[in-house]
Amino acid sequence: MQRPHSTARYDHWIHEADPTARITVLTSADAERPTGDLAEGVRRVTVDDYESPAATAALFRLCAADRPDRIFVNSEDDVLRAAEARTLFGIPGLGSATALRFRDKVEMKRLFEGLPVPAVPHRELRCGADLYAAAEELGPLVVKPRDGAGSTGVRVLADARAVRRACVEDPALLTALHGGTLMAERYVAGTVHHVDVLVDGDRALLVSPSRYTSPPHRFRTDNLGSVMLDRGSPRAKLLTDTAERFVARLPEGHGVHVLHLEFLEDTSGALFAGEVACRTGGALVKNAVRHTWGIDLSRASCLLSAGLWTPPEEPVPTGPPTAWLLWNGGPRPSVPAERPDWLVEFSAPKPPEGQRPPDTPVSSVDSRARFLIEGADEEQLEARLRLLYADG
């Protein structure tokens, strides 16, 4: 399955690894990828609306007519429906029971049980009284959709007065509560780390720990950036160990091949596990890992899911550590007048003709410009990120 805005060449990767493979790409009629870009012999099936139940029905029809050996997706929004297809038609890979634990943020917290870093304290919500109780028990709250992604729909409520104000000003919040679609967790003021992992069975093949320069939920007022942690630092070692233990505890035959974990560090240095997704990290995570480790997480996870990739015994860095920055809702960064060698990637996507870039991003990965830089260590990477604002 390929979302209409994706241009990744999954079919080419599979075809190169196994020229005899029969490949079908399910997408929508408005897909950005032209048919001519598909690998030789690839069948393309389109639907009018990729997000609709009709697209899921089309997937089921394909499975019923010619049961595939594997189904590959790389979007959080496709995880559950692909998993349901595997469960319904007996297809190997991530099934719906396990997939639900990666999409429901309450079930998700149970995946962290018994690990060195505990899950952030949280509560299920069904009404306004639950919100008041959560604020009394946990203090400042983050309220978010149980199945959300990209930090959309996230709000921070400081206390009971903020709870009341939010419910009065936005009655739709109560509707969401009554439908059981929201959850609350303690707001942890401090640093947010992310750990990106390539997985094969009970082994973490590659673990790359980083920290965001600003919490992702602040994308409307800040710019989202990320800096790779120094590999020998105590924080990197703890996060790597936690990620490896997380992988080792997954159920047998889980079908997960890539993970994006997020950890919260408060001002005292205490760590909590926040979220985990079984897909490649967004923004420039893939670019950063590829530059430093020489491994494309999307390609590797795709081929692992098809049984067509033999991973190296011990991945070793092929380049220096990296950091990246998105221009979201914060100050405008820019390329220095004399472009330095350490700026390894820069892009500023142009809006469709006749349209201007939106002033307000709609998610944490919605950006007007993207920068990928390299450096010797965290300190140098941070300094070079600051140089991107030197002309501002």
What are these regions (language model features)?
Residues M1-T98, L308-T310, E374-Y389:
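ATP-binding N-terminal substructure of ATP-dependent carboxylate-amine bond-forming enzymes
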Residues G114, L131, C302-G392:
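Peripheral (often C-terminal) accessory segments that flank ATP-dependent C-N-forming ligase machineries
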Residues V199-A204, D266-G269, G329-G330:
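Short acidic-glycine loop/turn motifs at beta-strand connectors
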Residues P118-V120, L141-V143, V156-G190, R220-G225, ...:
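Conserved ATP-binding module of the ATP-grasp superfamily
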Residues F112, A135-L157, T175-G190, V195, ...:
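ATP-grasp fold ATP-binding core
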Residues R186-H254, A273, A277-S305:
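ATP-dependent carboxylate/phosphate-activation module, predominantly the ATP-grasp catalytic core
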Residues T87-G153, A158:
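A conserved helix-loop-beta module that forms one wall/lid of the active-site cleft
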Residues G253-T267:
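A short glycine-rich, hydrophobically flanked beta-strand micro-motif that places a catalytic Asp/Glu
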